[in-house]
Amino acid sequence: MKVEIWSDIMCPFCYIGKRRFEAGLAQFAHQDEVEVIYRSFQLDANASKDPEHDVYGLVASKYGVSREQSIQMHAGLVQQAAELGLEYNFEHAIPANSFDAHRLIHFGAAHGKRTEVAELLFKAYFTDSKHIAKMETLKGIAADAGLDPEALEVALNSDAYKQEVLAECAEANQLGANGVPFFVVNRKYAVSGAQQSDVFLDVLNKSWEEVKPLIILDPSSSGKDGQVCTDDACGIGEAE
């Protein structure tokens, strides 16, 4: 079973949604049968790599509210995050363009580290107040994930993974995503937003009921073997 999660490193609800999904997945009886894939999405593809505003100022400008109102709005997010064991430090966060951070996720995916890199990026931005558009930050995250930071620098200085990021952003829109986080289960069920863990558990159970593996009963329990044709022979002479 496959769960694809579209998110942006800059999105506070995406990190919260990630934790709530993980909590739901932890309660799912068949969690070992679930493949989780983190997909790329950019809330602001035109964001600067060297932002002029901090998070409070950026949101105040975008939504036409005062800085004080912006701080109050973010206080609620800090509380939600804390309830999940996450530490949000908005006062020091640097809201830079996330495109290269998404390229790092794809670099990680190419080396079997997609999920680890996504987690490290969220922590770097929300908790550690790292500048996730800077090469040295991304190289440090790569190293923390057990990847080659010099190979990452070569990749980021080329066109590597650019089309993959753009394609996933476009695909989210094609699937009907109006925002992130956006969860798609087996390309059939979509869950939008940082829902509570029980919502994710419900959709996982529903999907599993539809795709659960076929159970072949053991004929030995009846004392007789069923008659079959194999690839190269039919047991006609053995018919009763």
Question: Each predicted region: which residue ranges?
Answer:
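Short, N-terminal intrinsically disordered low-complexity segments that are rich in Pro/Gly
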Residues: S7-M10, C14, A45, S66-R67
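C-terminal cap of thioredoxin/glutaredoxin-like
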Residues: I5-S7, F13-H30, Y38, H106-E240
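Structural alpha/beta surface segment adjacent to cysteine/selenocysteine redox centers
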Residues: R19-Y125, S222, C234-G235
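Glycine/alanine-rich phosphate-binding loops at beta-alpha junctions
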Residues: M1-K2
